[in-house]
């Protein structure tokens, strides 16, 4: 595959991570560059790791991916989005919410990288070398997630709790999109 093809693949796979980074960063106060870096490392790392996992597993995990992964992603994103909405409505009135603990980051990273797992499986079926696409996918996702986190914080700073609610709705919407795509392909 060409560099351009791998870059466009990375860009497509990074869109969910970009949106989730943007949504997540609206709730972090005080926000520091290390928070954006933490999001970028988790999302970029998982987007790079999951195709390798899919490539190594090949057809052994294809049944699981096609049958359950979309439901898992939907459940995780809906849970986290609902939690964000709840915290925006009933949380700390000072707005000091830190949802960047490692368990939440892990759930978000897994939920947004399930498509990358499926890409890795398709690479195995097509006998495609994995190293170059994985590096490009991980780097593109890292940059997109970092930019999404910084942008989300700047928007969130102006709109406070309304953006937290919108961010939660975006996460639920992404989960719904993943599930709808799965159900339409059955």
From Swiss-Prot:
Keywords: Cell membrane, Ion transport, Manganese, Membrane, Transmembrane, Transmembrane helix, Transport
GO annotations of cellular component type: plasma membrane
Membrane spanning stretches: 1-21, 41-61, 71-91, 105-125, 130-150, 165-185
Pfam families reported for this sequence: Mntp
Membrane association type: Multi-pass membrane protein
Superkingdom in the source lineage: Archaea
Primary site of residence: membrane
Compartments in which it is found: Cell membrane
GO terms for MF: manganese ion transmembrane transporter activity
Function noted in UniProt: Probably functions as a manganese efflux pump.
Entry similarity comment: Belongs to the MntP (TC 9.B.29) family.
Protein name listed in UniProt: Putative manganese efflux pump MntP
Lineage: Archaea, Methanobacteriati, Methanobacteriota, Stenosarchaea group, Methanomicrobia
Primary gene name: mntP
